[in-house]
Amino acid sequence: MRVDGRTNDELRPVHIEPNYLKHPEGSVLISIGDTKVICTASIEDKVPPFMRGGGKGWITAEYAMIPRATEQRNIREASKGKLSGRTMEIQRLIGRALRSVVDLQKLGEKTIWIDCDVIQADGGTRTASITGAFVAMTLALGKMVEEKKLPALPITDFLAATSVGIDGEHGIILDLNYIEDSKAQVDMNIVMTGSGRFVEIQGTGEEATFSYEQLLDLLTVAEKGIHELIARQKEALGSLAEQIMQHCSEGEEAK
């Protein structure tokens, strides 16, 4: 048994609360175990200067942690006057991941701003941010369709992320909490679509190596977890999830 009593391939309890805030076009509070992230999606009728006139939209993300999201208070990065390398890496990861499942041409010259604010951290904050941000973005785009600002959802597939790792005591484990992450011999973050295609694989040996066979096993366990996360996304999205599934089916038939 793991530190919190889970089996090796078991996610922590997942809860996605849609429309968590009243002002953003899309928002959720996602809780994965004791990790909690507020994700919002805001839409602007303009794109960055480098994209003007191209007819395509853009998706960008910001990520932050409140000072007491962790056991010891952290100084706000705004107070330091610059973002850490970790924060910049995570922001880029969230933006890249979401752009992979949106038809930016159909979005038109609009920018979707994703804001992910970690209010409690216990491992897996970047993967929780991606999983929650997808739901917030879908809610925002659904509102645009409802208001007839878009003819249809420009989303091509579902998207979620999780972590996997190798623990010296338990072997391959899914969805690492902070204690497990700090002790893992191998740590990996996986982003996948609903159709099982990889968007990002970030894997590191922590003073250890891992074999090709272990890599395949890690990916298999991650895929299981991501399918379960997408099932939770579908529950939170309701009829919007059905629209995405219909779009995916039409895309398969067109191939």
Curated annotation (Swiss-Prot):
Function, as annotated: Phosphorolytic 3'-5' exoribonuclease that plays an important role in tRNA 3'-end maturation. Removes nucleotide residues following the 3'-CCA terminus of tRNAs; can also add nucleotides to the ends of RNA molecules by using nucleoside diphosphates as substrates, but this may not be physiologically important. Probably plays a role in initiation of 16S rRNA degradation (leading to ribosome degradation) during starvation.
Positions with a binding annotation for phosphate: 86, 124-126
Catalytic reaction annotation: tRNA(n+1) + phosphate = tRNA(n) + a ribonucleoside 5'-diphosphate
SUPFAM superfamilies named among the record's database cross-references: Ribonuclease PH domain 2-like, Ribosomal protein S5 domain 2-like
GO annotation (BP), single: rRNA catabolic process
Source organism (scientific name): Anoxybacillus flavithermus (strain DSM 21510 / WK1)
Family from the record: Belongs to the RNase PH family.
Keyword Cell membrane assigned: no
Database matches in Pfam families: RNase_PH, RNase_PH_C
Catalytic class of the enzyme: transferase
Gene Ontology MF terms in the entry: 3'-5'-RNA exonuclease activity; tRNA binding; tRNA nucleotidyltransferase activity
InterPro entries (UniProt xref): ExoRNase_PH_dom1 (IPR001247), ExoRNase_PH_dom2 (IPR015847), ExoRNase_PH_dom2_sf (IPR036345), PNPase/RNase_PH_dom_sf (IPR027408), Ribosomal_Su5_D2-typ_SF (IPR020568), RNase_PH (IPR050080), RNase_PH_bac-type (IPR002381), RNase_PH_CS (IPR018336)
PANTHER family, alphabetized: EXOSOME COMPLEX COMPONENT, EXOSOME COMPLEX COMPONENT RRP41
Keyword Cytoplasm: no
Subunit structure: Homohexameric ring arranged as a trimer of dimers.
Keywords from the UniProt entry: Nucleotidyltransferase, RNA-binding, rRNA processing, Transferase, tRNA processing, tRNA-binding
EC number(s) on file: 2.7.7.56
HAMAP family: RNase_PH (MF_00564)
Spans traversing the lipid bilayer: none
Protein name, per record: Ribonuclease PH
